[in-house]
Amino acid sequence: MGFVEKMFEQTVKDVCGQTKIEYGGNKIEFKGPYKRLAFFDAIKEKTGDDISKMNEDELVKYCKSKNIETNKSMGRGKLFDAVFGEFCEKELIQPTYITDYPIEMSPLTKKHRSKEGLTERFELFINGKEIANAYSEQNNPIEQRKSFEDQMRLAEKGDDEAMFIDENFCTALEYGLPPTGGWGFGIDRFTMFLTDNNNIKEVLLFPAMKPEAVSYTHLRAHETREDRV
């Protein structure tokens, strides 16, 4: 997290001449250190409720009481995420680390070494958007297979985003993976901040564009006599 802070702070300073910028009507300070907040603490801070021990049925009832839309395919992970998205995400304007995500939201992540039910993962949010995601990789093949099996059960319920059991990956882990971690960040979203752009297509080198609509009259004008016979 310290590395990420230093990189973001220095990049903003080099590009903009200072560490504070204005984007979307918000003044954002990139100078570290950034606020750190555990996932369930962030939810409790906004709602006053501790939902960390709720089972699936209790979470569904809780979501309904808060007018959060749910469906039968949602497991604990997606229900937790729905609550966080409703009450917390859009409120994280200043750079903020959300840490200690629940296991159900992080199927490839190593379990937290001292906090039961949580993982060694953080995400960085700025201006209500996720900008970076990082975690310790799960390198225990037995635990990883269990996570994949949990994902398969969600897929059977209708979750089209659930993972499948990756046999090749599990086999590779059985040969051994040293302690590993990594992070990635949305460079396009970050560039939007630096250039004060609210359209991501404006900062993509090769944005995906829909083909220009061609009218029926235009097509008829270019048909040959043989085409019309």
Which residue ranges define each predicted feature?
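Flexible loop/turn segments at secondary-structure boundaries
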Residues: E104-L108, A132-N133, N139-I142, T191-M192, ...
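Hydrophobic alpha-helical segments, chiefly the membrane-spanning helices
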Residues: R228-V229
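Conserved phosphate/anionic-ligand binding catalytic regions in large, soluble enzymes, centered on
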Residues: E130-N133, E137, P178-F193
